Amino acid sequence: MSERKLFTSESVSEGHPDKIADQISDAILDAILAEDPEAHVAAETCVYTGSVHVFGEISTTAYIDINRVVRDTIAEIGYTEAEYGFSAESVGVHPSLVEQSGDIAQGVNEALESREGDTDDLSHIGAGDQGLMFGFAINETPELMPLPISLSHQLVRRLAELRKSGEISYLRPDAKSQVTVEYDEHDKPVRVDTVVISTQHDPEATNDQICQDVIEKVIKAVIPADYLDDDTKFFINPTGRFVIGGPQGDSGLTGRKIIVDTYGGYSRHGGGAFSGKDATKVDRSASYAARYIAKNLVAAGLATKAEVQLAYAIGVAQPVSVRVDTFGTSTVPEAVLEAAVRQVFDLRPAGIIQMLDLKRPIYKQTAAYGHMGRTDIDLPWERLNKIDALVEAVKTVL
């Protein structure tokens, strides 16, 4: 009997409480960067019934109307009705932001290398904290992402499209998806085994109507027919009712959906969240750089699967480690790939910021439906512009 395995990933909609918090944090970051690209920002958000708290550390010359940014973000998501228990114009907004610690700032503003005499401008900025970050790519999808998380994101994005267009008028903003994919003995996806979708809805909507609409207009519109068969299981609103949702149903916090934000559990994660952080925080910028490296390695044909780990010390510019793992799929030794990566990519924080142009207000758009593998927006870490350089670097190393 051939050995087959299942793997499951989930996603959540922009109206999920944790994602509301992420989007508010990144909307604040973008508003600040639009006025002050050199700002240091660590903005956290908590949402619950009727209230939003924004707190954290910020050093900037910009002045922004946080109250307005918060309300506009909530309205864009779709929380505009008082009956939702959380409405853009009626929530209480409570900001509590202070200046970044001087002890941290001195290591970020002048890295150890700079203090020791390195005059390279890109050695001037130190990492904003210690930590380890992972990036991943695999040739399962055109965007080089694992199939389970790719499908999960597409399902909740489709729900949002149908809600905002009015095609399914009873939908409300909160939703979750989960997709289980079956893999063959060669680790190739062969079918979708299970799809779970829970979507918030108006009280008059019936379970039968919701199931029919979600299967026909969401699942079958997103998942290729070749992956669906008579044995594929659908669980649509399996509790039977999902009227109370969003922050009325659960509180939400920035940074609680880090697996949704990345690879759906298919790859390792260093533990650091992204939203609300400027690019001097390597939790964010180095994770983007690691994805950029992994995607270009796979696209270059140097591996069919690649995971890149980067690690940093606070106040130090150069990474303390760079690791490439291809799970036995590389065409050359992994040590060669690591050497090529170091040759092609400047992985100092300032190098990453320059390479990916990360001082721009581009972050709010990443705060729902994944930071990696996006095909609907132009993100610099998704570009395949290092393929030739990597191939040439491998030749020089060999």
From Swiss-Prot:
Cofactor: Mg(2+); K(+)
The enzyme's E.C. designation: 2.5.1.6
Binding site for K(+): 44
Residues engaged in binding L-methionine: 57, 100, 250, 281
Enzyme class: transferase
Pathways involved: Amino-acid biosynthesis; S-adenosyl-L-methionine biosynthesis; S-adenosyl-L-methionine from L-methionine: step 1/1
GO molecular function: ATP binding; magnesium ion binding; methionine adenosyltransferase activity
Catalyzed reactions: L-methionine + ATP + H2O = S-adenosyl-L-methionine + phosphate + diphosphate
Role according to the record: Catalyzes the formation of S-adenosylmethionine (AdoMet) from methionine and ATP. The overall synthetic reaction is composed of two sequential steps, AdoMet formation and the subsequent tripolyphosphate hydrolysis which occurs prior to release of AdoMet from the enzyme.
Name of the protein this chain belongs to: S-adenosylmethionine synthase
